[in-house]
Amino acid sequence: MKTIMLVCAAGVSTGMLVSNMQKAAKEKDVETDIFAVSPNEADGYLSTKEIDIVLLGPQVKFLKDQLKEKISSKNIPIEIIDMRDFEHMDGAAILDRALKLV
């Protein structure tokens, strides 16, 4: 199972994106645990849960270096979600990109 954590401003759009990614994973028969957290919650999840990849919403891309430093010892990839894919809520494209990085 691949665990994918999205860090975002925790809005409605991210909830829809998580749902679209979960649907795409089910269609591809890929076992995943995909969830979204706010920037304030990210540290807690990174220290208590096995995360395979961190995806940042475009609106919080400024956090990349800060989070990368915190997870450098864990070798967890961190990636900013493509703005176009985010705007189109393209869960399949975002999932494919995430799976290529793990």
Q: What kind of region is each of these model predictions?
A:
Residues K2-M5, A9-E41:
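Conserved active-site segments centered on acidic
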Residues T3, P77-V102:
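Ser/Thr/Gly-rich flexible loops in soluble cytosolic domains mediating phosphotransfer, phosphorylation
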Residues G15-V18, K61-K68:
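Short, surface-exposed alpha-helical segments at coil->helix boundaries
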Residues S19, K23-E27, E69, D96, ...:
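Short, well-ordered alpha-helices that flank and scaffold nucleotide-derived cofactor binding pockets
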Residues E41-Y45, L63, D90:
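Short acidic active-site motifs
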Residues T48-I53:
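Short acidic/histidine-rich motifs immediately flanking catalytic phosphotransfer sites
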Residues G57-Q59:
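Short secondary-structure boundary segments
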Residues K64-M83:
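A short, gly/pro- and small-residue-rich
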